[in-house]
Amino acid sequence: MVMDIWTISLRILLFPSALVLCSDSFHSECYTVNGADYRGTQNQTSLDGGKPCLFWNETFQHPYNTLKYPNGEGGLGEHNYCRNPDGDVSPWCYIPEQEDGVYWKYCDIPACKMPGNLGCFRDHGNPPPLTGISETSNKQTIQTCITMCRRQRYKLAGLEAGFACFCGNNADYRKHGEMPSTDCNSVCFGDHTQPCGGDGRIILFDSLIGACGGNYSTDSAVIYSPDFPDTYGTGKACYWTIQVTDASIIRFNFTLFDIKDSRDMVELLDGYTKQVLIRFDGRNHPTHSFNISLDFVILYFFSDRINQAQGFSVVYEAFKEETIEKPNGSNNPSQTEMITQTTNLSINAARSSKILYVITTSPSRPSGHVPGWTIYALTGLLILTIIAISAKALLHISMKSARLASSSSLDSCHRGSAGEIWSIFYKPSTSISIFPKKLKGQHDDRNPLVGE
């Protein structure tokens, strides 16, 4: 199978895991529970005889239009696709006004259903679709119900009429029939942006949604931040292990990332060495999907005791090496992609030492033009040092002086202090420069898996 990705790999003996940057190859209609992220093209309220939607640039008599939101806020634009610009329980659109004064309707979009949302079903009441424990609450939210069911070790959680929660393991929950998603749009009493079923209609969820930690071994899955779709709590420290037998690459794609606090963070670690491969936080958001050349990865999330946000959803997919091929180009020739990774030095280096690698290249270059450089440990560093210094020296002094300068520079490299950071900038067909650099504002790693 040919995968539409653009790849650059860096392999270093000091850090045996290669982290690969690639273009975004995952796509799903919705990853939020209310479809606020829907950017599809359905332009009628239902695929089966629904009302046609009005264009957002022709609805100036209504609150939401392109005149008021000219920069694409909420996905609005010169189109008539269903959207959810106001954070309602599901996408909707304006319609030609009816005799009863209705001028908008929810859109029933089968493809806009976040993973873990099993759908909307009939509830005849005797017996109910889920036959475990139940409760009612005037503060009901989706995660409140899911948490109760998960604590009681039920696999399914269902909500009905905005305030009722049901738990169970019933495999035949579909027996009374599946209904349109709009039948389950009664707002949750505890959060009016979330759908909590309807009258005689129950919306079902997998109870793993929003769990703080878990173990995954399937080829693909979606992992949500703790307490999702509610905001994540304070003081969280969660681990998810992802170990896929025979996988050579695991691809990660953050389909949602809303972490505003710079002290809250998401890390991906080598499952074998516990070394941090990449870190994201409130200031450093993931902008692309990326591959990790391992079959065992740990996802770690930490939140401090102040501030909260929506959190994240991440899709992972495991591949065998023969299924990955490079394309000839990219959809965005002008875009320069960059990834930064910080790694620990060798076991004998000082604990405060770090190496910062910054690799840049253009995805528009044909794959045949992308250098296949592989840098091995200190040998690679020595070669790059000699090339860079020799090239500069040739402009001014003889070859003998250049070799002396290279030897002197190599000695000074080995005498660098333990707390010093080296940055390597590499661009195809351009010069290579190596220089020491202090990493400002780097907080100590709060991940207990990383040794002191």
From Swiss-Prot:
Glycans are attached at N43, N57, N215, N253, N291, N328, N344. Residues 114-208 form the WSC domain. Residues 29-112 form the Kringle domain. One of its GO terms (molecular function) is transmembrane signaling receptor activity. It comes from Xenopus laevis (African clawed frog). This is Kremen protein 1. It holds the Pfam family CUB. Receptor for Dickkopf proteins. Cooperates with DKK1/2 proteins to inhibit Wnt/beta-catenin signaling by promoting the endocytosis of Wnt receptors LRP5 and LRP6. In the absence of DKK1, potentiates Wnt-beta-catenin signaling by maintaining LRP5 or LRP6 at the cell membrane. GO terms for biological process: signal transduction; Wnt signaling pathway. Keywords: Cell membrane, Disulfide bond, Glycoprotein, Kringle, Membrane, Signal, Transmembrane, Transmembrane helix, Wnt signaling pathway.
